[in-house]
Amino acid sequence: MNIQESIKKRVYEKVVNEIDWENQFSDVKKSCIPPDALVKDLQAVLDRAALPSNKRGKLPMNKAIVHKNSVPQTEEGEVDVKAFIDDITTFPNKLISQNGKMEKTSKGNAWVVNTGIPALRGIVYDEDGGKFYTVNTCPGAGGCALVCYARQGSYVMFDHTSMNLTRRLNLLMNHPEVFEQIIYLELKRFCVEKNKKGVKVLMRWNDAGDFFTKKYWEIARSVTEKLLREGHDFMSYAYTKMGDFMGDLSADIVMNFSREANKQQLSKVDLDNTKASTIVPRDLFRDLFTSTGGGHFKKASDGKPEFNDATGREELKKRLAKEYKVPLSSVIYQEDLPSEEQAPNTFNVIVLPSGDSDEAAQREDVMLIFLLIH
């Protein structure tokens, strides 16, 4: 019996399945979905998938992503709500994974893994209340919602990816204590396995989604502190648009605040003294790289975009320093970060549209991360 199966057996013996809206999740922004509205939404997923790709348009930001293969149907061709409930409330195969960017970051003496939940919106079924809800999983999102990477690419192309994120969210909200125990045990296993080989384990929270509720943040903090107390060579880091979690210095989590957060969250943060990331629009750099058409750039053997000429690298640094009002001497490419961390907030780091790792987000000597939009 694996970890998930063992814990699942114990939880059903001990607890009532219900979302604690009154206490643990009182801060969650949600809306109830009537059964007929859910059926309509799921049928719309099937109808949309039947259209040519150039006719589908973008999915509204207030709708959760559901893959067409995740919409079960009866023999009569109608949406099978019961089967959908069973599917999204099934325990996820795992809470921790490793995407392509984390693989690039895992080198030498570091092993980087990540976890996430649906971006912007997710569907949750209250197992005790018997109701569906749309949950706002990124309540601090501002301009980043328009270009959210976690609502495109593999996150929407593959049904197992989007379904696993949805299952994580449902486990988190229906059984938060179980969620915490599973993710702790998964991380501990990695720590034991990797640490004995001299490899440090790094965990990125919010690969997709955000700390949409204080409870989720508390789980991340609790798991991190427990692993550190046990003496594991481990660290946690995260991107967030939630200003309330940037000032908690006891959390042992390296936080990166997104400057594309909404005004309410921006007002809670001193941007001049906060480690942060910002999305750099294409207009600021597209002419510096070799285009292959269709908005794509020619890539070198390392996967990074090629500059048109030798002056491009320095020109990009100058443009960023001027646009974001930071000293030119502080602007460096991620590949030029020294192997040993320097004093906090020393560098402002360029992360290219492709080929770069997530190292800048993990280091406290990096103040501002320039994320060149994909």
Per-region residue spans from a language model:
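Class I S-adenosyl-L-methionine
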Residues: 2-374
